[in-house]
From Swiss-Prot:
GO terms for cellular component: plasma membrane. Heterodimer of a large membrane-associated beta subunit and a small pyruvoyl-containing alpha subunit. The gene is psd. The lineage of its organism: Bacteria, Pseudomonadati, Thermodesulfobacteriota, Desulfuromonadia, Geobacterales. GO terms for biological process: phosphatidylethanolamine biosynthetic process. Belongs to the phosphatidylserine decarboxylase family. PSD-A subfamily. Its cofactor is pyruvate. It is an enzyme of class 4 (lyase). This is Phosphatidylserine decarboxylase proenzyme. It is found in: Cell membrane. HAMAP family: PS_decarb_PSD_A. Catalyzes the formation of phosphatidylethanolamine (PtdEtn) from phosphatidylserine (PtdSer). The record marks 187-188 as: Cleavage (non-hydrolytic).
Amino acid sequence: MRPSNALITPEGYPFIAYSAGLFLFLAGGAVLLKSVALAVPAAVTLLLVLFVISFFRNPERMPPADTALLVAPADGTVVYVGPATQEHLGACQKISIFMSVFNVHVNRAPISGTVVDRFYKQGKFYDARHADASCENEQCGLVMEQDNGVRVAFVQIAGLIARRILCYAEVGDRLERGQRYGMIRFGSRVDVYLPEGLESLVTVGQTTVAGETALVRLG
């Protein structure tokens, strides 16, 4: 497991370095040459630097005290709540969360337990807000089992802009609820598959906070 507790994820360091270097080059040229033509792109590049820093932010999160609550694995907006079929769980419930480029993109474990399966599927890069993204897009998923035997699957899905899924958890790893386990660059979706019969605590259109927003109560 590689996830860091740093305020900025290490995955963002190269992007920050490149954009900051470009800004310094343009800003330095604008000052030395007294060039408005360089000052304008320098200002635009500074905005890019700030955006990149914001995208790779990695804030601390505090899961709810009630350990029976399954929490959101991603920041974003709920785009689907309803029945589904998942190859590892069979008939189940699904809650889908869409992450825009302005959301925190660090993903967190929704429950405490052991990773019992990991799967990857190559695919398309459709808009992650669309239902077809769950089946057609590139994705990486984990199946976790709680100590009481309850299993939950959650799947990182690439989107129209997001083209890189990072998942550091492996089969056999023990994850705690709210623990960082990966991220997706740059705008994407996470689907959570749950046992049937659970009452959803969120609705379509609701905003979620990874590691804090309760999606359902397990048991």
